[in-house]
Regions:
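Hydrophobic (often cysteine-bearing) scaffold residues that line and stabilize catalytic clefts
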Residues: 16, 58, 146, 150
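Active-site segment of metal-dependent pyrophosphate-handling enzymes
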Residues: 72-119
């Protein structure tokens, strides 16, 4: 179920949001990070992810995130290759508007997916979540602005 902006605002003000984040690893064990355009976490590098919509099964949520954020998809028969990294909580002082009028609370299921298990989507999607992507590994510059919540994932990989 898709919520209009006012309904979503009411949910964010009054309850935690269930979400999924995707740690996508290439064959060199580097993780895909995107520089966030939207609040919260704007301007930080973060993994692809998004909220779970009411009535949306996990497979379809992951598929939607993959298609809309990186233009990839996973076949249903390959879904069993995805592994759960863990369940995390994210607390932000601001919200998707970028103001401090109300905070955000996310309960996040974090999954690990190997790039080789994905295929390029036939439909080109315009990404409105990230404006730059990198393949990151621990040896890269400390000057990258990686979000602390994302660093928690990196520590568990």
């Amino acid at each position: 179920m898709y919520l209009d902006e006012k309904s979503f605002e009411n949910v964010v003000k009054n309850s935690p949001i269930a979400a999924i984040d995707l740690c996508i690893l290439n064959e060199s064990k580097e993780i895909l990070l995107g520089k966030r355009i939207n609040h919260p976490a704007r301007s930080f590098f973060f993994v692809p992810g998004g909220r779970i919509r009411k009535g949306e099964k996990l497979f379809f949520c992951i598929q939607r995130i993959l298609k809309s954020e990186i233009n990839y998809e996973i076949l249903e028969e390959d879904f069993s290759k995805i592994s759960l990294l863990g369940v995390f909580q994210h607390f932000y002082d601001n919200n998707f508007y970028g103001n401090n009028l109300f905070s955000s609370h996310y309960v996040v299921l974090v999954y690990v997916i190997k790039l080789k298990d994905l295929k390029k989507s036939k439909i080109g999607i315009i990404n409105d979540q990230h404006d730059e992507y990198i393949w990151y590994n621990d040896s890269q510059s400390e000057n990258l602005l990686i979000h602390p919540y994302c660093k928690e994932y990196l520590d568990k990989l």
